[in-house]
Amino acid sequence: MSAVISLPDPQPRAARDPRVAEREQHKLAKRLRRQVGEAIADFGMIEAGDKVMVCLSGGKDSYTLLDVLLQLQKKAPVPFELVAVNLDQKQPDFPEHVLPEYLAGLGVPYHIIEQDTYSVVSRVIPEGKTMCSLCSRLRRGALYNYAETHGFTKIALGHHRDDMVATFFMNLFHHAKLSGMPPKLRSDDGKHVVIRPLAYVRESDIVDYAQARQFPIIPCNLCGSQENLQRRQVGLMLKQWEKDHPGRIEQIARAMGEVRPSQLADTTLFDFMALGRRDDAPLPDAHAWLAGSPADADADPETPTV
């Protein structure tokens, strides 16, 4: 079986007039450029003189990211450099020729990092268990190290709007916190700025765009590992919501940018203590507000007198 796949059309359609299809593709490309441009502007993702490392996995998302950034680079208000970087993790049957041939054809500066993380993951993770988490950490470390040693000022990843929404619910359901996958962040060690220019782009548009552009897609499961079950369940939930209530994912994505700390309950984000407190009032003593004194706590509650 070939290690390069073609993306199916998500919704099979009857044969269309080629001119209509061309117009739709043009509109889609224009929409993606606008959304990526808006994300870059809204979050200050790219500045004059930036050297941007575009992480290219061979999947539809990273191909789309690189393609749109190359288009924007030609007319961007500031000059910046793009370099495509792929990490060859030595997975079984990985088609090593695909990305170099594709990138050379584009005339894009690129580099292939060769690091056998697959053997490490295979040795550490028991057979049948999901490898994705450890694999992701090792991949991130390799990419961060390369970015540091080669002077990259930004690291661009291909996560899109739907990824960000799914991560929000993963953290909500499994970690009891309201957090997600930000469009821009500084790495934990403080050395790198990571950007996600596809933050406003929906996955279905990426599927259509990758199909139209005929990217040489490399599947992400060559290692044989299965998708994280929890993430898969969240993905199915969101797809069902979108099917039952079209536009729901977009509403959730917008809500993530409309946070009202005073309408939540995090005392580190909003000073509830000062809200409505008199100037002469002492700060409340939390211990004094516990359920009675120690003696009272062990006693039976009084029976109200009728």
From Swiss-Prot:
Its EC number is 2.8.1.-. It is an enzyme of class 2 (transferase). The keyword Coiled coil does not apply. One of its GO terms (cellular component) is cytoplasm. It comes from the Bacteria. It is found in: Cytoplasm. One of its GO terms (biological process) is tRNA thio-modification. Pathway: tRNA modification. Gene3D superfamilies: HUPs. Residues 14-25 have a biased composition (Basic and acidic residues). Residues 297-306 have a biased composition (Acidic residues). It holds the Pfam family ATP_bind_3. Belongs to the TtcA family. PANTHER family: AMINOTRAN_5 DOMAIN-CONTAINING PROTEIN, SULFURTRANSFERASE-RELATED. The thiolation reaction likely consists of two steps: a first activation step by ATP to form an adenylated intermediate of the target base of tRNA, and a second nucleophilic substitution step of the sulfur (S) atom supplied by the hydrosulfide attached to the Fe-S cluster. This is tRNA-cytidine(32) 2-sulfurtransferase. It comes from Stenotrophomonas maltophilia (strain K279a). The lineage of its organism: Bacteria, Pseudomonadati, Pseudomonadota, Gammaproteobacteria, Lysobacterales. The gene is ttcA.
